[in-house]
């Protein structure tokens, strides 16, 4: 699929989610992927749903006064969690390419009275952020959606300060998917067909200039979560995939949390 077409369909898919709040991560699932009940208690209502695959904030070792940049910030959940840690002396910037998500995040920001959070409309391949801005970059199940992941990591490197940290959660492949799944629009929006092999993902981060790159956590999604997810059901219906075969695909996918440093 062409890069422009991919971005268009992802933007449209996530715009629909922003309007309906119909995402895969119910409160029960959010806790399964790393968000605690205590954390969720302190975010605005409407931000407490996630399209992610982990909690990058939990592993980012944020410090008071730091500037955090979230790539693909959605409704703002991770931004608000980060803001609670860095405090009023810190700053959090969320970037998302979907206008409806930016509107949703800004609304949530107003509801939560956050003075240290801002949301910017833009693409993660061309961040509307100055060089050497962030102490920490986080991202949650977004980079797999980009058709130009190499460029994303180069932009992350550019916008980080020297010594800045990268802490991202994302979906990677442990084995190649069938061509029919790779070409599926629903599978792309569902963070599946855009994913690359784990070794390739790490290689792209290192190629951008990051050092000390390591996978700090690797998990499989619960099979019942994948098979019963509304997006997964749409993929199964589109490609006429029975539940048993879908479970085999689930074994090809992992959620990883990756750490790196800008030297």
Regions found by a protein language model. Give the residues of each.
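Conserved alpha-helix/loop element of class I SAM-dependent methyltransferases that forms part
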Residues: 29-67, 71, 78-85
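Short alpha-helix
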Residues: 193-209
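A short acidic, Gly/Pro-enriched loop at the edge of an enzyme's catalytic core
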Residues: 64, 125-136
């Amino acid at each position: 699929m062409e890069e422009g077409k991919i971005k268009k369909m992802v933007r449209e898919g996530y715009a629909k989610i922003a309007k309906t709040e119909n995402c895969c991560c119910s409160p029960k699932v959010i806790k399964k992927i790393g968000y605690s009940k205590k954390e969720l208690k302190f975010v605005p209502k409407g931000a407490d749903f996630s399209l992610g695959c982990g909690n990058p904030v939990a592993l980012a070792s944020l410090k008071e006064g730091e500037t955090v940049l979230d790539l693909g910030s959605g409704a703002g959940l991770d931004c608000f969690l980060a803001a609670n840690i860095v405090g009023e002396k810190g700053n959090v910037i969320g970037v998302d390419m979907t206008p409806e998500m930016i509107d949703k995040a800004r609304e949530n920001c107003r509801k939560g009275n956050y003075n240290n959070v801002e949301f910017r409309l833009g693409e993660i391949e061309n961040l509307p952020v100055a060089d050497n801005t962030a102490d920490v970059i986080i991202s949650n199940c977004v980079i797999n959606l980009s058709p130009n992941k190499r460029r994303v990591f180069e932009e992350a490197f550019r916008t980080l300060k020297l010594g800045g940290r990268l802490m991202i959660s994302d979906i990677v492949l442990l084995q190649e998917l069938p061509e029919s799944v790779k070409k599926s629009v629903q599978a792309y929006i569902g963070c599946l067909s855009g994913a690359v092999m784990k070794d390739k993902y790490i290689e792209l981060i290192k190629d951008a200039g990051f050092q000390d790159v390591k996978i700090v956590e690797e998990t499989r999604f619960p099979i019942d979560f994948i098979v019963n997810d509304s997006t997964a059901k749409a993929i199964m219906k589109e490609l006429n995939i029975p539940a048993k075969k879908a479970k085999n695909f689930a074994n090809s996918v992992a959620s990883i949390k990756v750490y790196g440093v800008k030297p």
